[in-house]
């Protein structure tokens, strides 16, 4: 149980620091970068946790952290649009799963790629995607 408590505590502490004030469209890349950098800072710990029975803790931590980041961005981009709450949540979940999947693969591979390179590639691939998804989900327009 002690290892689970340590993992949970470490994750919560890092999450608070990583995302402080970085949940907007203009700052999400910085928030995602800081998540990756915080994982890389304690690389040995997180790789060991990932390969142990407590991997689920890392996954749950990343899902919560990334959803909180993405729902902030989605809500900001949806301002002034008529979009159902469940559609906004779906968009945030979609990006959450993409980001967490990439992050878990990065951990599984030993965290070799630079966090900034990952964020740059994600930013390039997703550019405009949230706004386009919200536009497609608009009600009555």
Which residues make up each language-model segment?
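C-terminal peripheral helix-coil segments that are non-catalytic and often amphipathic
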Residues: 75, 89, 96-97, 105-141
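Cytosolic nucleotide-binding catalytic cores of signal-transduction proteins
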Residues: 82-83, 127
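Amphipathic alpha-helical segments that line or abut small-molecule/effector binding pockets
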Residues: 25-44, 93, 101
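Amphipathic alpha-helical packing segments from all-alpha helical-bundle domains
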Residues: 55-80, 89-101, 131
């Amino acid at each position: 149980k002690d290892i689970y408590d340590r993992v949970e505590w470490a994750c919560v502490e890092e999450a608070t620091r990583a995302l402080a004030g970085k949940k907007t469209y203009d700052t999400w890349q910085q928030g995602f970068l800081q998540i990756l950098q915080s994982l890389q800072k304690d690389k040995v710990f997180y790789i060991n946790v990932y390969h142990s029975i407590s991997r689920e803790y890392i996954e749950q931590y990343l899902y919560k952290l990334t959803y909180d980041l993405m729902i902030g961005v989605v809500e900001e981009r949806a301002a002034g649009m008529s979009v159902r709450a469940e559609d906004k949540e779906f968009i945030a979940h979609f990006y959450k799963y993409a980001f967490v999947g990439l992050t878990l693969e990065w951990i599984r591979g030993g965290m070799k790629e630079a966090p900034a390179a990952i964020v740059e590639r994600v930013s390039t691939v997703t550019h405009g995607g949230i706004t386009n998804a919200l536009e497609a989900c608009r009600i009555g327009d």
